[in-house]
From Swiss-Prot:
SUPFAM superfamilies in UniProt: SAM/Pointed domain
One Pfam family of this chain: SOAR
Known role: Plays a role in mediating store-operated Ca(2+) entry (SOCE), a Ca(2+) influx following depletion of intracellular Ca(2+) stores. Acts as a Ca(2+) sensor which upon Ca(2+) depletion, activates the Ca(2+) release-activated Ca(2+) (CRAC) channel subunit, orai-1. Essential for Ca (2+) and IP3-dependent contractile activity of gonad sheath cells and spermatheca. Essential for fertility. Does not play a role in posterior body wall muscle contraction (pBoc) rhythmicity, intestinal cell oscillatory Ca(2+) signaling or intestinal ER Ca(2+) hemostasis.
Domain of life assignment: Eukaryota
Biased composition (Low complexity): 411-424
Name of the protein this chain belongs to: Stromal interaction molecule 1
Entry's Gene Ontology molecular function annotations: calcium channel activity; calcium channel regulator activity; calcium ion binding; identical protein binding
Entry keyword Signal: yes
Compartments reported by the entry: Membrane
Transmembrane portions of the chain: 190-210
Gene giving rise to this polypeptide: stim-1
Top-level taxonomy: Eukaryota, Metazoa, Ecdysozoa, Nematoda, Chromadorea
Sequence positions that bind Ca(2+): 55, 57, 59, 61, 66
Length: 530
């Protein structure tokens, strides 16, 4: 029984010892900076050498002026980097002692670097791959960095075998930067990502700029093509107008070659026809009284169309100037930035304006043609010229004014002339001779009708600044195709005394026949002018 008790007591003692030893192994031991001075004497000595090198006045503490001078002279730092390191080194303490410097190094992350991290720092940041093998062989970690940075240490020469003073100085400065101010990762991923994003954004902006510039160039080319088409239409319109003027001139020249005999016969026939119309009709003077009103209406309508055409030419000139300004502004930096940002461009307004101008010119051209056809038809129905006055304008106006504004006087005179024809056969011939005016030379046988707009408009060309004056010179011989038998019967009837009245009554329908022949003539002329 006593032996069993001893065995149990020995077993319990062994378990207690094992538990106590296990607790000691897993316990986390905290080492202070003061204790670390004793454990890492060489590191503390290196920190003290660095502090002594920075303390110029040997007061036992490093102020801001001393740290600034050390960074400028020994570490060759300038600008914002020096300011950043100075603020990190001092913080809120303007006097840094040896213990402060040792505690800052003791609590730094760089002191816990492993051998692999130290080798990576030597390769990537210091760029000294030649000493990597020696560092790996000696299994050096981050605690050795103060000895690298110490100005009085022979560790670099003796332990690592660095013979080059340039390499030693390079390693010393980099180690001093890490010990005093901490490690700064130059390969900042955030910066790389930001730079990549900016590069992508710049590439996208350049692509959009090129795309918008191509679209703008394409739109300008389209506008230029449309403007060229508009100019072609203008040229065609002017050519047609010129052809029309040439045709009118040719007709006036061809009609002006009428000989002296035909002109005399024409005047005699007109005189006789008007006498018969006044003697044998009651209240039939309305068509002749309507003639000046219709002519005035025709002139006003043609002047309005001419005004519309001049306005169209003016807007066409403004469109050309706008396209020229758009082409000049295309190469400017401001225009390129507007195109890149997708701002509204004025080219859409120019495009719509050119389309509206084109449609308006076509409408004016169609309306002008329809107006000419309509007035030619009115001429055919009325039997007197309205659109283009001929050489008989003065005769017709004098007849209309004398017979309708002095109706009572002329009515009595015409009836007296007929009664005198019964008693005096030669009276008719004398009246005919008195009213026949001298023949008009061929050069003066045409009358000109000028359509002048009420307001001066600028045309599309610089030489068209004067108002457009359109000379219309087409002579109309109302009785060119009258038969010789009708003329002879009128003249013979006037010379036969008592038979003159019967002859006049027999030829009573000559003036309506004259109107019918004039209608066919006007229709043929209207078809040709169109």
């Amino acid at each position: 029984m006593g032996r069993v008790s001893w065995i149990i007591a020995l077993y319990l003692t062994i378990n207690v010892v094992i538990v106590v030893n296990g607790d000691r192994v897993t316990r986390n031991v905290e080492v202070t900076a003061e204790e670390e001075k004793i454990r890492d004497k060489l590191g503390y000595e290196a920190i003290r050498d660095i502090h002594r090198d920075m303390d110029d006045d040997h007061s036992g503490s490093i102020d801001r002026n001393e740290s600034t001078g050390f960074m400028k002279e020994d570490m060759q730092m300038r600008g914002s980097e020096r300011t950043r390191r100075e603020n990190k080194f001092h913080g809120d303490d303007d006097a840094i002692t040896v213990d402060d410097l040792w505690e800052a190094w003791f609590e730094s992350i760089e002191r816990t670097w492993t051998n692999e991290r130290l080798v990576e720092w030597l390769i990537n940041d210091v760029n000294l791959p030649s000493i990597v093998e020696a560092v790996k062989a000696k299994k050096i970690d981050g605690k050795i960095l103060p000895r690298f940075a110490s100005p009085n240490s022979d560790f670099l020469n003796k332990e690592l075998g660095i013979k080059s003073s340039v390499y030693r100085q390079k390693l010393r400065l980099n180690s001093l930067d890490v010990v005093l101010f901490g490690y700064k990762d130059n390969n900042n991923r955030t910066k790389d990502i930001l730079l990549a994003f900016l590069a992508l954004l710049l590439t996208s902006l350049i692509f959009l700029y090129v795309r918008q510039k191509q679209k703008a160039q394409q739109k300008v080319n389209e506008l230029s093509n449309k403007l060229t088409e508009l100019k072609c239409m203008e040229t065609e319109f002017e050519d047609v107008q010129k052809m029309l003027n040439d045709e009118r001139s040719k007709r006036s020249i061809s009609d002006g070659v009428v000989n002296h005999t035909e002109m005399e016969n024409l005047r005699v026939q007109l005189e006789e026809a008007e006498r018969r119309l006044e003697a044998n009709s009651n209240g039939s003077q309305a068509p002749l009284a309507l003639q000046p009103l219709l002519r005035r209406t025709c002139e006003n309508e043609m002047a309005f169309l001419e005004k519309q055409r001049q306005d169209c030419f003016k807007e066409m000139k403004e469109a050309i100037e706008m396209v020229d300004r758009l082409q000049k502004k295309q190469g400017s930096v401001l225009s390129s930035l507007k195109l890149a940002t997708g701002a509204a461009s004025t080219s859409d307004q120019v495009d719509s304006k050119i389309f509206a101008l084109k449609s308006r010119m076509e409408k004016i051209h169609t309306l002008t043609r329809e107006t000419q056809e309509r007035w030619l038809q009115i001429e055919s129905l009325c039997g007197f010229p309205l659109l283009y006055l001929n050489e008989t304008e003065h005769i017709n106006r004098s007849i209309a004014s004398s017979h309708f504004y002095n109706k009572s006087h002329e009515g009595s005179s015409s009836s007296g002339s007929i009664s005198n024809a019964h008693s005096n056969p030669n009276a008719v011939n004398s009246n005919f001779v008195k009213k026949v005016s001298p023949p008009i030379p061929p050069s003066q046988q045409t009358a000109n009708l000028r359509f002048v707009p009420t307001e001066q408009s600028d045309s599309i060309h610089s030489e068209d600044t004067s108002p457009i004056v359109e000379d219309v010179a087409i002579s109309r011989s109302l009785t060119q195709d009258l038969a010789e038998a009708d003329m002879q019967s009128i003249v013979s009837g006037s010379t036969n005394g008592s038979g003159s009245v019967a002859a006049l009554k027999k030829r009573k329908g000559i003036f309506p026949k004259l109107f019918r022949r004039n209608t066919s003539k006007s229709s043929s002329l209207g078809g040709t002018s169109n």
